[in-house]
A protein has these predicted regions:
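Extracellular/periplasmic helix-exit of transmembrane alpha-helices
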Residues: 339, 343-347, 351
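Conserved P-loop NTPase catalytic core
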Residues: 348-375, 381
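Catalytic nucleophile serine of serine hydrolases
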Residues: 332
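Flexible phosphate-sensing "switch/lid" loops adjacent to ATP/NTP-binding sites
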Residues: 1-322, 327, 344-347, 370-371, ...
Length: 498
C-alpha cells in the first residue's frame, strides 16, 4: 500500500492563520479528488471534541476533517493539552487523559510520545492520498527547539515539505518571515518550499516590491498572498477574538459568562449566526445588564470558576436575574455550578479536596472523580418550552451529577440527562445547538417572552451553512495560492489520482 504525500503549514507566530489554511488545503485537495486527512501532533486548546468511539481531540482538526469531508479521527490529533491553570495542563494522549502535568514535567517527557505520534501519522498515511499537517506557534522558538515534536521536529520525522505563513494583518510580516527563516538551521530552511502572506487587505500590487525583496533575501518563493477572507468557520486562532467581539445589536440579548477557564464555547456559534440572537461574553457584573438569557458555559476548572463567580459578584447578579424570571442555561461545568453542591473529595478538579455550595438553582449534587466521561450521543428534549427538539452532541466531563428533579432530555439509550427547574436548564451535552431544532425553539421561547414576532427569521441548517463556508474558504485560498507549486512540493501533479 502506497504512503500518502504530505504538506505542512507552519506559521511565524500563533494566530498566523495556520488552522484555516490547513482547512482550506483539505477542502481543495478533496475537491480535486484526493483522500485527505489533517494532522497535528500536539494541540493546546480549551475547545475539544469527542469522536464516535469516545476519544477526545482538538476541534481544529475536527474542522479540518469536516472540510476534507471525512469523519474526525483521534489519530488526526494524538496529543491534546488542555490548560487547567497558568502553569499546568491536562495531557490527553490518543484521546484518553494521562493526568495533570506542569509545563516543566510535560517538556521533560514529551519526546517519549514520539512513538504515539508516528503510529497515528503512519496509520493515517496508509489510508489517504494526502496528509495536511499543521504546526504550532512558530518553528523559530529557539528555547523550545531541542525537544520539538510539532514543527520542524515533526517535519523531519515524517519528511514533510513546509509552507511558512505570516500574518500581515498584524503588521511586520516581512520581518516575521525573514526572521523566522534566519533563525532556522540550514536543514530546516531546506524544508521550506514557499512563503505565504496571509490575511492581506488591499491591492496586492502594493506588495510586489516587498515580495521581490523577501524572495531575494530568503531565497524562497512566495507562493501566495491570501486575502483577509470573511468566512464563518470555527478557527482555533480566532476563538479568543470571538470572546472579545461585540456583536451587532439584535432583538434578543444573550449574555454568556466568560469564565476564566471557559471551554467549548464553540457550542454557541450557531446562536451567534441567528438573525434574532445577539450573543455577548461578560466578565463583570456591570456588563451583565438585563439580558433575555444567561448562559453558564463549560469550563476546564469548575471549582475555581465558581469561586470567581462568587467573589466577583456575578453569582449574586445571576441569582437576582433568575429570581426575576430571566431564563438561565448551564452547559457541562456551567450545569454543575447551577446545582446545590459540588464535591471534590480527592482534589481532582481543584487540586485540593473541597466542597463548594453551588448557585442552588437546580436540585443537583456533583461529585468529581478521576474517570472522564467521553461519549457522542443523540437526545430528545422532554421539557417545555423545548419539548420535541432533537439534538446530537457529546459529553466531556469528570463529574457525576445526582439529579433530584426533572430531566432536560432523554438520551438515545433512554437515559434521562440534565435537569430543569422553572426557567433554569442544565445539560452536559456539548454541540446542543448544532442541529438547529433547539435553537429555533429557544428563539421562539425568548421571542414570546419579549413580545417579538419571529416570523421571517429563517436559519440555514448548520451543516449546510458550514459546507457553504468551506467552499468559500477553498475558493478564496485556491485563487490566491500557486497550487501547481504546492502540488510540486509534494512530488505530485494535480490529477495523479486519476
Amino acid at each position: 500500500m502506497s504512503k500518502a504525500k504530505c504538506i505542512m503549514v507552519q506559521g511565524t507566530m500563533s494566530g498566523a492563520g495556520k488552522s484555516l489554511l490547513c482547512a482550506a488545503l483539505c477542502r481543495i485537495f478533496a475537491q480535486d479528488g484526493y483522500r485527505v486527512a489533517p494532522f497535528k501532533s500536539q494541540n493546546m486548546a480549551l475547545n475539544s471534541f469527542v469522536t464516535r468511539n469516545g476519544a477526545e481531540m482538538g476541534r481544529a482538526q475536527v474542522v479540518q476533517a469536516q472540510a476534507a469531508g471525512v469523519e474526525p479521527d483521534v489519530r488526526m490529533n494524538p496529543i491534546l493539552l488542555k490548560p487547567s491553570s497558568d502553569v499546568g495542563s491536562q495531557v490527553i494522549v490518543n484521546g484518553k487523559a494521562r493526568g495533570q502535568m506542569s509545563a516543566a514535567d510535560y517538556f521533560r517527557m514529551k519526546r517519549s510520545l514520539i512513538p504515539d505520534i508516528l503510529e497515528a501519522y503512519n496509520s493515517l498515511a496508509a489510508e489517504n492520498d494526502i496528509i495536511v499537517i499543521e504546526g504550532a506557534g512558530s518553528p523559530a522558538e529557539i528555547n523550545l527547539k531541542a525537544d520539538d515534536i510539532v514543527n520542524m521536529g515533526l517535519a523531519k520525522l515524517v519528511d514533510a515539505p513546509v509552507l511558512l505563513a505570516g500574518d500581515i494583518d498584524r503588521g511586520g510580516v516581512f520581518a516575521q518571515l525573514y526572521g523566522t527563516v534566519e533563525l532556522l538551521e540550514a536543514d530546516e530552511r531546506a524544508r521550506i518550499r514557499g512563503l505565504i502572506i496571509n490575511k492581506f487587505r488591499g491591492d496586492v500590487e502594493i506588495l510586489r516590491p516587498g515580495l521581490a525583496m523577501l524572495e531575494e533575501k530568503t531565497h524562497l518563493p512566495v507562493v501566495g498572498v491570501v486575502p483577509y477572507l470573511r468566512v464563518e468557520i470555527e478557527d482555533e486562532d480566532s476563538l479568543s477574538d470571538r470572546l472579545e467581539a461585540k456583536n451587532a445589536v439584535k432583538p434578543l440579548d444573550i449574555a454568556i459568562l466568560r469564565l476564566p477557564h471557559v471551554s467549548n464555547f464553540t457550542d454557541f456559534i450557531p446562536l451567534e449566526q441567528h438573525p434574532l440572537l445577539g450573543v455577548r461574553y461578560v466578565q463583570r457584573t456591570r456588563q451583565l445588564g438585563a439580558p433575555d438569557l444567561v448562559i453558564l458555559p463549560g469550563t476546564k476548572n469548575t471549582m475555581d470558576d465558581l469561586r470567581w463567580l462568587r467573589e466577583g459578584g456575578l453569582e449574586a447578579a445571576v441569582l437576582r436575574l433568575s429570581a426575576a424570571g430571566t431564563p438561565v442555561l448551564g452547559v457541562c461545568g456551567g450545569y454543575q455550578m447551577l446545582g446545590e453542591q459540588l464535591c471534590d473529595p480527592a482534589g481532582e478538579e481543584s487540586g485540593t479536596p473541597c466542597t463548594l455550595r453551588g448557585l442552588g438553582l437546580l436540585p443537583t449534587t456533583t461529585v468529581f472523580g478521576t474517570e472522564k466521561h467521553l461519549t457522542q450521543t443523540a437526545a430528545c428534549v422532554t421539557t417545555e418550552p423545548f419539548a420535541g427538539a432533537k439534538l446530537t452532541g457529546y459529553e466531556i466531563h469528570a463529574g457525576r451529577t445526582e439529579v433530584r428533579g426533572s430531566a432536560f432530555c432523554i438520551l438515545a439509550d433512554g437515559t434521562p440527562e440534565g435537569c430543569v427547574q422553572d426557567s433554569v436548564f442544565g445539560t452536559y451535552l456539548h454541540g446542543l445547538f448544532d442541529t438547529g431544532e433547539l435553537t429555533e425553539k429557544l428563539t421562539a421561547f425568548l421571542c414570546k417572552r419579549k413580545g417579538i414576532d419571529p416570523a421571517g427569521a429563517e436559519l440555514i441548517p448548520m451543516e449546510q451553512y458550514r459546507q457553504q463556508q468551506f467552499d468559500l474558504l477553498a475558493d478564496g485560498v485556491r485563487a490566491a495560492l500557486d497550487m501547481p507549486a504546492i502540488y510540486a512540493a509534494m512530488g505530485m501533479q494535480k490529477g495523479d489520482n486519476t
